[in-house]
UniProtKB/Swiss-Prot annotation:
Function noted in UniProt: Catalyzes the folate-dependent formation of 5-methyl-uridine at position 54 (M-5-U54) in all tRNAs.
Protein name as annotated: Methylenetetrahydrofolate--tRNA-(uracil-5-)-methyltransferase TrmFO
Main location: cytoplasm
Gene assigned in the entry: trmFO
NCBIfam families in the cross-refs: gid_trmFO, PRK05335.1
Organism: Syntrophomonas wolfei subsp. wolfei (strain DSM 2245B / Goettingen)
PANTHER family: GLUCOSE INHIBITED DIVISION PROTEIN A, METHYLENETETRAHYDROFOLATE--TRNA-(URACIL-5-)-METHYLTRANSFERASE TRMFO
Ranges that cross the membrane: none
Keyword NADP among UniProt keywords: yes
């Protein structure tokens, strides 16, 4: 029986391994945890979420919602698990982290054609079909081998993880429930600040003691996961137009709008833990307690998880990969996940499905396929394989990646609806083409 190595038991690796297994292909899935830990993983589970517990919007006419619909057409394992681990989060699809990772692990272990190898991979096997899905925390040894294979220096920047707080330590007399603009159910907890409270918080934040490491001014951060203190340094109102924007959040029983608002999102099914939305940070733990407790409602906050920084590694995909995710220099190697330069949980998982599809087709001697550029997945693959290699930066799913409608549609809501309808038709065609 033919075999594929899948290196990395994260979101992309699990999707790739599962797809291959469903096609009757033997898989060796390599995961270095718990033999070798990372700076942010807490368990040995497959598919562990280490940043937010939100998989972003599930609204059908959004880019993130469309991405999920496309993945469901392709038989996504992770979205099936996510539905079973879902927690209230308004229009977003958020999950209980532990339950989600447990379900993913169970599904993989239940596949008889998948052999789970709990070992670190230092070198990509020579002469064997492999999918590299080692993620943002690729080990130094494997990163060195990838540099040898690709002839390129990997690019590094630093993602930041937001703190999580015990629900019973929150002062609910100062906090109100609501979702922005009333979309979905009122699943978010909102901590309103007046101008004086915000300015005090802001001054403390920009003068916070930051963990030692790479210069905060020289580090590269992807905007979707930028540390709050870095956002704050861009200007006094940067947070108020970012994660602390008050628009669409009316204080119950008051005609006055808050000057700024911190949102908290439920992270577990029991509702005992809430995460600070958009407040990834690299502050020292003591500083996190001191500064975040300045926010009304968080004065006695018990932090069950502090914000931390971790490295993200990704390759120069425009130089190295075809849209099929096959390596140009080594055709027996495919890449998937954040290491390809996609950003986001579902984006990473989607590339795992595509890598699995094309690894299977390569084994079978069939032509490699990618979804049409009018699909979100196809547009992402086109972006990472055809962008300028001189200043390549990670990208997440958004409608701006899609080709314009012909003729143009001026009304945004109608345009987005047209994008979705066109994409779903194209993804349906792609799914049918896989039968050949």
């Amino acid at each position: 029986m033919q075999q594929v190595n899948v290196i990395g038991g994260g979101l992309a690796g699990c999707e790739a391994a599962y797809y291959l297994a469903q096609k009757g292909i033997r898989v060796r899935l390599w995961e270095m945890r718990p033999q070798k830990a990372t700076a942010v993983h807490r368990t040995a589970d497959l598919g562990e979420l280490v940043c937010s517990n939100s998989l972003k919007s599930d609204q059908p006419n959004t880019a993130q919602g469309l991405l999920k619909r496309e993945m469901r057409i392709l038989g996504s394992l992770l979205l099936s698990c996510a539905e079973k681990a879902r927690v209230p989060a308004g229009s977003a699809l958020a999950v209980d982290r532990e339950l989600f990772a447990g379900l993913v692990s169970q599904a993989i272990l239940a596949c008889p054609s998948i052999e789970l190898c709990r070992e670190e991979v230092n070198r990509v096997p020579t002469g064997e079909l492999s999918i590299v899905a080692s993620g943002p925390l690729t080990s130094e040894a494997l990163a060195a081998d990838l540099r040898r294979i690709t002839g390129e220096e990997n690019l590094f920047f630093y993602d930041a993880v937001a703190p999580s707080i015990s629900a019973d330590s929150l002062d609910m007399n100062k906090i109100f429930r609501a979702s922005r603009y009333g979309k979905g159910s009122a699943d978010y907890l909102n901590c309103p600040l007046d101008r004086e409270e915000y300015e005090s918080f802001y001054e403390n934040l920009i003068n916070a003691d930051i963990k030692a490491g790479h210069s905060i001014d020289k580090s590269l951060f992807f905007n979707a996961c930028m540390p709050a203190e870095v956002i704050a340094r861009r200007g006094k109102d940067a947070l108020r137009y970012g994660p602390m924007r008050p628009v669409g959040l009316e204080i119950p029983g008051s005609s006055k709008r808050a000057y700024a608002v911190l949102q908290l999102r439920q992270e577990d099914k029991a509702g005992t833990i809430y995460g600070m939305v958009g407040f990834q940070t690299r502050m020292r733990w003591g500083e996190q307690e001191r500064i975040f407790r300045l926010i009304p409602g968080l004065e006695q906050a018990e932090f069950v998880r502090y914000g931390v920084m971790h490295r993200n590694t990704y390759i120069n995909s425009p130089k190295l990969l075809w849209p099929s995710l096959q390596c140009k220099k080594r055709p027996e190697i495919f890449f998937a996940g954040q290491i390809t330069g996609v950003e986001g949980y579902m984006e990473s998982a989607a590339t795992g499905i595509i890598a699995g599809i094309n690894a299977a087709r390569w084994l079978q001697g069939k032509a490699l396929l990618t979804p049409h550029k009018a699909t979100i997945i196809g547009a992402l693959l086109d972006f990472i394989s055809s962008s300028s290699s001189q200043d390549f930066q990670p990208m997440n799913a958004n409608f701006g990646l899609l080709p314009p409608m012909e003729p143009p549609i001026k009304d945004k809501a109608k345009r987005y609806l047209a994008y979705v309808e066109r994409a779903l038709n194209k993804m349906g065609e792609f799914s049918e083409s896989l039968l050949n």
